[in-house]
């Protein structure tokens, strides 16, 4: 994964990578991958979905998941809690309002 993304960044001059289900990867690999990419392009963007679709063999502090975000080095994650507080509706087929849609009960982002 590290070699592949480095190749694509060099060869195709890609400016960023987005990882679906990033929590299926371990933090160490994601940190190494990001560090390698930053040597190629210090402004490269790396981010992903910090969830695992309901299961992973990685346990505790090893997975690149939302609750371990403080250990991410140089890359980011989606924040579904902030998203839901801001826009709410549409994510689960509900018509609930979020903060942006003038909800008075939505948590502040």
Positions of PLM-derived features:
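Active-site-proximal helices and loops of the catalytic beta/alpha 8
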Residues: 21-109
